[in-house]
């Protein structure tokens, strides 16, 4: 629960119980990346890249986990588990932990070349994309022309 508290107090996310679902679903998304072999391919490539190129690759990994969190949210909606405002809570959480938002808050300026998790806009867009699709049909952030 400490990360939940940080999202609210330190990062400015809207308060709500669905934030926990978003965070857990995002982390489960990383597990899906692990069992599908994406994570091992990512780790192999990271060993061959400069820091800048490694950051650019990592920025492709994180929104994919946000996409998967969106797929889970869609399932929850289809099952009737969501309350009004839940999706807005998840979007607020994703926005609040985008690299640009975090950097601006911490240092007053943004350095896109140092991003490791994607911008607020990218993170929320991929969450929404997963929510709208409701399946894995559009989850390939690595081949996407634009994040």
Regions found by a protein language model. Name each.
Residues 1-21, 34:
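Active-site scaffold of zinc-dependent metalloenzymes
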Residues 9-13, 40-45, 53:
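Zinc-dependent metallopeptidase catalytic helix centered on the HExxH motif
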Residues 12-23, 52-63, 81-85, 117-121, ...:
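Soluble non-cytosolic domains of exported or imported proteins
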Residues 22-35, 66, 70:
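Active-site recognition of the HExxH zinc-binding catalytic motif
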Residues 28-43, 77:
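Catalytic Zn2+-binding segment of zinc metalloproteases
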Residues 44-51, 108-110:
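Short linear capping/connector segments at secondary-structure termini
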Residues 53-56, 60-102:
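Short helix/loop segments within enzyme catalytic domains
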Residues 97-147:
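Pan-zinc metallopeptidase signature
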């Amino acid at each position: 629960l400490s990360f939940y508290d940080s999202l609210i107090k330190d990062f400015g996310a809207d308060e709500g119980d669905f934030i926990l679902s978003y965070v857990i679903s995002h982390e489960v998304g990383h597990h899906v990346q692990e069992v599908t072999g994406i994570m091992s391919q990512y780790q192999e490539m990271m060993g061959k890249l400069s820091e800048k190129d490694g950051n650019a690759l990592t920025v492709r990994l994180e929104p994919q986990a946000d996409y998967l969190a969106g797929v889970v949210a869609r399932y929850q909606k289809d099952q009737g588990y969501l309350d009004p405002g839940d999706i807005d809570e998840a979007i607020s959480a994703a926005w609040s932990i985008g690299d640009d938002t975090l950097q601006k808050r911490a240092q007053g300026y943004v350095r896109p070349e140092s991003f490791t998790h994607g911008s607020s806009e990218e993170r929320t867009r991929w969450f929404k994309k997963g929510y709208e699709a409701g399946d894995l049909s559009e989850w390939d952030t690595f081949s996407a022309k634009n994040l």
